[in-house]
């Protein structure tokens, strides 16, 4: 069968990891894997990334929502889970907000709640770090024959590599 062989090297920047993914097998197996993991959304092959984590472990589209304090504050209000404040105290901090800002917090909070109930995570951020091992998709990717070089934030995307190894 085909063999997936990862290696990682840290960039000079502490946040970035350079990954080298070597794919071994027959020419047909290699082409099948490269085709399966390549970005599909862009139509021209030149700008298309040779690796898209969504083609390996797809993230539910509903999770593609802003990750930030607005949503977490709205969620705390909705379910009353603020660790340090009661619902009333949370609302007091909202006194300086416009009605539109309050509504946005509640909308984000409701979305976070729905996502957590459905997927176990409120946003893309929590889901990706758990399921991909990194917060962003592959970046600055290039391909040379059966080798793909790509960057990731913070760490090697071990769940992605494992999923590829299991599948192929």
Q: Where do the protein language model's features map onto the residues?
A:
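Long, contiguous binding/interaction regions
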Residues: 9-168
């Amino acid at each position: 069968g085909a063999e997936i062989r990862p290696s990682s090297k840290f960039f000079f920047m502490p946040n970035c990891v350079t990954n080298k993914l070597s794919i071994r097998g027959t020419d047909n197996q290699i082409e099948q894997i490269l085709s399966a993991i390549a970005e599909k959304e862009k139509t021209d092959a030149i700008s298309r990334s040779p690796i898209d984590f969504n083609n390996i472990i797809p993230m539910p589209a509903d999770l593609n929502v802003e990750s930030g304090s607005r949503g977490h504050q709205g969620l705390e209000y909705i379910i009353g889970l603020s660790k340090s404040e009661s619902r009333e105290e949370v609302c007091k901090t909202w006194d300086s907000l416009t009605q539109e800002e309050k509504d946005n917090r509640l909308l984000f909070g409701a979305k976070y709640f729905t996502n957590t109930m459905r997927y176990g995570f409120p946003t893309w951020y929590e889901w990706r770090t758990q399921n991909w091992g990194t917060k962003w998709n592959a970046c600055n990717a290039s391909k040379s024959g059966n080798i793909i070089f790509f960057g990731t934030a913070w760490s090697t995307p071990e769940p992605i590599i494992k999923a590829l190894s299991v599948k192929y």
